[in-house]
């Protein structure tokens, strides 16, 4: 589910989480209609659910979705990833072996869940009504589950890492070990940032990024451990907007964690918004963030990918070099909705991915109108994994 469909579930989500009923909502995070309807992607919908008691796990790309969707817990989960940019992207991925997948399933927990069902042989009280004398105490009784949950997730990530050779953590750091400028983000922008970080560090800079996987419950100690001690400037990127708030959700969580640990004296912290309604976030946007962090007085609040000539929050983006892996071939096709261009390109990339050793990536840009609108197909092929979740702007083939 996603967007308004997810928001309609919020009253039930409070009950599901309150009764500790294990379930998973897989959410391709999409925009919630505000001043206008938009069917495309950002984190507006999942951020509206963060107070329900659901745990929240975020994946950055297609491969991570395949790997991390197997994590289980008594606490219900929202397992989310970027709508359209990740959910509609075609990539070559390594899939689970079913024997390995079977080992990830705790059958004792399944049996315990089944025994929790309504049964006259196992009577229990449900749907109770409580007054002010005991409601508060019972509401606090779930604390232990949420305190233990990050360790449960870490345990399962450890199993995944052991079986698949990955390195998933609650917060993954990427970049120079002695970075002085760091970005914190979650979702597909992390892959864009990885390419920029590789380029900048290869040219003498010292930058890095913390990728958030487990967003709720938020483990501040794990986040702080992931930030290099050398960091002097920090930018937190959110893919949502809360009008009237002092900052966006992830930014406020990070600021609180830093304040409680007395780390504010060590670094500047700024927050930005990006990608609302699937606005493209190219490498130029990430370069602009690192450039802003160099300043003595950077913007406390900023936006990426647009030109804000009203409130002047946008960062200036300059022409930047290509950061995709050497040897990547980029192709761009224009067509009209319904003319077969998108379908032909989907089949072509799947054939090349299935029958060659090439890595492939396909993403299709189109509007939300009926048949006849312009479609743009963005295809990439290469000998190295492709981490480029943004539109092609320097095509080898058109």
Where are these predicted regions, by residue range?
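N-terminal alpha/beta PP-like core and its mobile active-site loop of ThDP/TPP-dependent enzymes
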Residues: 4-57, 80, 101-102
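Conserved thiamine diphosphate
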Residues: 39-83, 95, 107-110, 256-275
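A structural-propensity feature for long, helix-poor, extended segments
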Residues: 35-54, 220-242, 364-397
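Conformationally flexible catalytic loops at phosphate/diphosphate-handling active centers
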Residues: 77-172
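Glycine-/acidic-rich phosphate or pyrophosphate-binding loops and their flanking alpha/beta elements
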Residues: 158-181, 314-328
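Anionic-ligand anchoring segments at beta-strand to alpha-helix junctions in alpha/beta enzyme folds, i.e.
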Residues: 177-178, 182-213, 327-394
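Peripheral docking tails and interdomain loops at the edges
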Residues: 233-324
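Short acidic, glycine/serine/threonine-rich loops at helix termini
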Residues: 8-13, 34-40, 67-68, 88-95, ...
């Amino acid at each position: 589910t996603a967007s308004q469909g997810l928001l309609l579930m919020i009253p039930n989500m409070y009950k599901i989480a309150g009764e500790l009923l294990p379930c998973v909502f897989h959410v391709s995070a999409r925009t919630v209609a505000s001043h206008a309807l938009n069917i495309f992607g950002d984190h507006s919908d999942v951020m509206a659910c963060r107070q329900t008691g659901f745990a929240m796990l975020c994946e950055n790309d297609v491969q991570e979705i395949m790997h991390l969707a197997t994590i289980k817990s008594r606490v219900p989960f929202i397992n989310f990833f970027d709508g359209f940019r990740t959910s509609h992207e075609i990539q070559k991925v390594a899939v689970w072996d079913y024997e390995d997948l079977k080992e990830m399933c705790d059958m004792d927990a399944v049996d315990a869940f089944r025994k929790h069902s309504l049964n006259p042989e196992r009577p229990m009280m449900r749907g109770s009504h409580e007054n002010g004398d005991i409601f508060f105490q019972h509401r606090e009784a779930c604390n232990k589950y949420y305190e233990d949950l990050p360790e449960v997730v870490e345990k399962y990530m450890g199993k995944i890492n052991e079986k698949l050779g990955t390195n998933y953590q609650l917060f993954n750091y990427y970049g120079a070990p002695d970075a002085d400028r760091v970005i914190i983000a979650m979702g597909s922008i992390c892959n864009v940032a990885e390419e920029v970080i590789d380029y900048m560090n290869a040219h003498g800079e010292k930058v890095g990024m913390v990728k958030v996987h487990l967003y709720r419950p938020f483990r501040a100690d794990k986040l702080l451990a992931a930030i290099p001690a050398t960091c002097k400037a920090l930018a937190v990127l959110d893919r949502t907007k809360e009008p009237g708030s002092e900052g966006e959700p992830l930014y406020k969580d990070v600021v609180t964690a830093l304040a409680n640990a007395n780390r504010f004296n060590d670094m500047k912290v700024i927050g930005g918004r990006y990608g609302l309604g699937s606005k493209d976030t190219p490498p130029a946007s990430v370069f602009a963030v690192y450039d802003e962090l160099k300043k003595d007085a950077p913007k406390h609040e900023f936006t990426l990918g647009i030109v804000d000539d009203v409130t002047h929050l946008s960062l200036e983006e300059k022409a930047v070099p290509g950061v995709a892996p050497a040897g990547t071939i980029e192709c761009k096709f224009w067509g009209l909705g319904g003319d077969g261009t998108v379908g032909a390109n989907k089949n072509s990339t799947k054939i090349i991915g299935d029958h060659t050793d090439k890595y492939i990536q396909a993403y299709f840009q189109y509007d939300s109108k009926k048949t006849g609108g312009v479609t743009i197909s963005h295809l990439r092929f290469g000998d190295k994994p492709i981490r480029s979740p943004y539109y092609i702007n320097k095509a080898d083939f058109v």
